[in-house]
Regions:
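Phosphate-backbone binding interfaces of nucleic-acid-interacting proteins
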Residues: 1-224
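Core mixed alpha/beta domains of very large multi-subunit molecular machines
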Residues: 50, 213, 218-248
Length: 248
């Protein structure tokens, strides 16, 4: 079972100990932690950028030469007179004024870390044109399987209260600056109260001898209305195979 420490922190009102210490306590009193994933490290260096310019590559039909605005957040990269960074991109959906995710030189492609063969980017020429890092697709960021184009960010993709800003840390913006603990499933077979982040948060509070208060929504009594309900008709077309069929 995967447990997000970011979610756990939202459910408690005390400070967690360092990750190594917390893992040790969980191992001793709850169950074995098979793996600890540091998402912040996986996405280290990834930045939100705006594509300011997009032109056809002079030496390749399927490549584009872009100029991106990273808010001057990344040091030690070549910039033009306007402070923009040049990146060559092969995605068919790249265009000016879109928002994308940039992996600058010295950063590592997140998907390659998961594959066990970390690939670190650098500044290099592609068909004679300098490209500083890459604009990433969903599969390269390990957030999806799409490789047909780069990730196109829009305001509706963001968590509430967040805004697209050039140079924003991708992991921090999307809540990926997190640790995920993978706790063995066998431990939970006799602990159905831990079948979820809330139950694990309660258990961690107990392990650390801290008080725990369930969120308000957890204690609300469910009320089922009968005035504005949507009409629902249910029929059983195969009673010989399904003698009892119910809808709730």
């Amino acid at each position: 079972m995967k447990v997000s420490l970011s979610v756990i922190k939202q459910l408690i009102n005390f400070e967690l100990p360092p990750v190594d210490e917390l893992v040790q306590r969980i191992n001793q009193q709850l169950g074995k932690v098979d793996r600890v994933e540091n998402l912040a490290e996986r996405y280290r260096g990834a930045r939100v950028v705006r594509v300011v310019e997009c032109a056809k590559h002079p030496n390749a039909d399927r490549l584009s030469v872009t100029k991106i605005d990273d808010g001057m957040a990344v040091p030690d990269v070549l910039r033009d007179e306007n402070g923009l960074v040049q990146v060559v991109c092969g995605a068919p959906n790249v265009q000016a004024d879109m928002w994308a995710v940039w992996l600058p030189p010295t950063s590592t492609v997140p998907a390659s870390i998961l594959e066990g063969e970390p690939f670190t980017l650098d500044a290099r020429k592609l068909r004679g044109v300098l490209s500083q890092g890459m604009l990433a697709a969903a599969d390269e960021l390990a957030i999806g399987t799409d490789h047909e184009g780069i990730v196109a960010l829009t305001p509706r993709d963001l968590p509430a209260g967040k805004a697209l800003q050039p140079g924003a840390d991708f992991a921090a913006l999307f809540g990926l600056d997190d640790y995920v603990l993978d706790i063995e499933n066998k431990m939970f077979t006799h602990r159905p109260d831990c079948f979820g982040q809330l139950g694990v948060a309660r258990e961690i509070a107990g392990i650390l001898h801290q008080p725990f208060t369930s969120p308000t929504w957890y204690n609300l009594e469910q009320v089922f209305g009968d005035g504005d309900s949507v009409p629902l008709a249910v029929s059983n077309d195969i009673p010989q195979l399904v003698p009892r069929f119910m809808a709730v």
